[in-house]
Regions:
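Walker A/P-loop NTP-binding motif of AAA+ ATPase domains
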Residues: 1-81
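C-terminal alpha-helical "lid" subdomain
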Residues: 59-147
Length: 147
């Protein structure tokens, strides 16, 4: 955890200690880096009653999320199995962005205003997103950096 964040966290935890147990106040604490939290910070009675870990969606969950985000958008689903296979380890927001970009590809090639996402639109959007994701990973890891 960044050293500058400790005072803020300690202050928040101290304020929580001052609340009466019967107060109608619920705190939801979230982090994507639970590994950085010191267990003793949250271990005091009354601070954290329950911890819930949210994992990345499995194939069935990705299909359900895909259907949810697609809504009533007309789409050729013939390549969906390949998309689901290639999206192992992605978040729900990735899938939402995938559908948004596929719709943009469809809109770019449509003159009559009827939006119909093809399997090629979906594949192109997925390729673009995965390329962006891989480029970001290479940048973060310094791949190709001679120094």
């Amino acid at each position: 955890m960044h050293p500058g964040r400790h005072p803020l966290l300690f202050q928040l935890l101290n304020e929580m200690d001052g609340l009466a147990e019967d107060a109608d106040v619920v705190f939801l604490l979230t982090t994507n880096r639970a590994d950085l939290l010191e267990p003793a910070l949250a271990a005091r009675p009354g601070r954290v009653d329950q911890a819930v870990e949210l994992t990345l969606p499995d194939r069935d969950a990705r299909r359900a999320l895909f259907d949810l985000y697609r809504g009533d958008l007309a789409m050729d689903l013939s390549g969906l199995d390949e998309v689901l296979d290639r999206t192992d380890g992605v978040t729900a927001s990735f899938l939402k962005e995938l559908i948004r970009r596929a719709a943009l590809f469809a809109a770019e090639r449509t003159d009559d205003g009827a939006l119909d996402v093809s399997a090629a639109d979906l594949t192109a959007a997925l390729d673009e997103l995965l390329d962006t994701r891989n480029a970001m990973t290479r940048t973060l890891l310094g791949a190709g950096d001679p120094g």
